[in-house]
């Protein structure tokens, strides 16, 4: 597993790029955001011990957000499922944290989806008239 230094203001990856690495913050902090219609939407501010970019290990899709260093950062770079597996085996506390965080992210995504479905469901319902 490699380590990289990213200076404050440096870009770790950009929305739309394709690569397969995820990152663990060893020091510093990182902002994750995306841009739609020239509006920047912050998704998260990450600090030491946090991770980001993990979807790239499991999906061959372009990045959906940009990651930018807020402070000077040292990042561990995990570039394969095998590296991740080894890292998780060697860091059981991080493994438990990762499972909790991924479960929280999935729960938040589900809540947003349910909210949007409820918001729009009335627009598409067809009610059969009663006799």
Question: Which residue stretches match the model-derived regions?
Answer:
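Regulatory nucleotide-sensing modules
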Residues: 1-33
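Cyclic-nucleotide recognition modules
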Residues: 11, 44-98
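Short, electropositive, low-hydrophobicity segments enriched in small/polar residues
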Residues: 13, 20, 32, 53, ...
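Solvent-exposed strand-loop boundary residues in beta-sheet-rich modules
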Residues: 36-38
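Short, mixed charged/polar active-site loops
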Residues: 40-42
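A small-molecule sensor/coupling module
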Residues: 83-123
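Helix-rich terminal scaffold detector
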Residues: 123-127, 131
């Amino acid at each position: 597993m490699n380590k990289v230094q990213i200076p404050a203001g440096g870009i770790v990856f950009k929305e739309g790029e394709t690569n397969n690495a995820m990152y663990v913050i060893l020091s510093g902090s990182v902002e994750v955001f995306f841009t739609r219609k020239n509006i920047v939407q912050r998704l998260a501010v990450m600090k030491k011990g946090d991770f980001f970019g993990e979807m790239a290990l499991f999906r061959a899709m372009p990045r959906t957000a940009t990651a930018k260093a807020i402070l000077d950062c040292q990042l561990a770079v995990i570039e394969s499922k095998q590296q991740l597996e080894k890292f998780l085996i060697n860091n059981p506390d991080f493994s438990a944290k990762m499972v909790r965080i991924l479960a929280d992210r999935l729960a938040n995504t589900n809540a947003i989806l349910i909210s949007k479905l409820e918001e729009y469901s009335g627009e598409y319902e067809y009610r059969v008239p009663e006799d």
